[in-house]
Amino acid sequence: MKLLQFKAVWCNPCKMQTKEFEEIPVDIELVPIDVDEDEEGLTTQYSVRSMPTMILVGDKDEVINRWTGFTKSSTINEFIQEYSNKQ
């Protein structure tokens, strides 16, 4: 699994969100994506319209869950734990 973090340098909630990611489990790949420099088009592909947006994707890039706006790492961690236990 990987966690896509859509952000922008001018976005204050994005800066706070980045600090929250220090608490994300190490087995989750964190992929920061600056929406203003997104050459791969992931912002459009995942229909991101506000920042920060975090999207948890599986091994085949399927969307597992998405969070929009500042989200506590504990909320994301709880979801990841519950999802992993079901697999």
Which residues does each PLM region occupy?
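CheY-like receiver
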Residues: L42-Q45, F79
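Thiol-based oxidoreductase modules, predominantly thioredoxin-like and allied folds used
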Residues: F6, V26-E40
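Structured loop/turn residues at beta-strand edges in well-structured enzyme cores
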Residues: V26, R49, E62
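Local sequence-structure signature of Cys/Sec-based thiol-disulfide redox active-site neighborhoods
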Residues: M1-I24
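Non-catalytic, surface beta->alpha helical segment in thiol-disulfide oxidoreductase systems
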Residues: I55-Q87
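Chalcogenol-based redox active-site neighborhoods
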Residues: K19, I24, Q45-Y46, S73
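Structural micro-motif
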Residues: Y46-I55
